[in-house]
Amino acid sequence: MPAVEHVEPSFPRLNGTEEQVTWSMVEYCRSVLLLKCQNLSDGQLKRRATPPSELSLLGLLRHMTKVERYWFQRCFLGSEEGPTYSTTEHPNADFDDLDSIDTDEVVARYVAACDLSRQVARTHRLDEIAVLQRGGEDVSLRYIGVHMIDEYARHLGHADLLREAIDGSVGG
């Protein structure tokens, strides 16, 4: 059974408040990443791009789990949770050693990280400042939302190419 079976696409709002448009775009990006992983086997999710790239759809899910947790839990809330996958010593671990990885667990961790991020977005204003600074500067939740759109946009392009190489599927 595929780790990601059925995903309802979440389309972004075309109008509304800044908050509504920002979070609907982030939500859209999350749903597209899951759509790119939908109905694929473990082997297909672990399939790497053309060398020397280490990218895979499963690696992208692991990476975006880390990104969600870092920006919403660690940076904004100040959570002391340790690294999700990569560490200072092993910065590319999101994409490495996938052969023995349980894909269902990776998907569950991604979904859980997104749920926690949604909770932060629902209960805080865009102009609120994160607990942690970056480069000595305050970080607003607004910045985090925009950064998430940028981060997803970069990796959704990768996901498009990876999925097309697996089974010819395009769009999303």
Regions found by a protein language model. Give the residues of each.
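Short, contiguous alpha-helical
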Residues: M1-P12, E19-N92, L132-G172
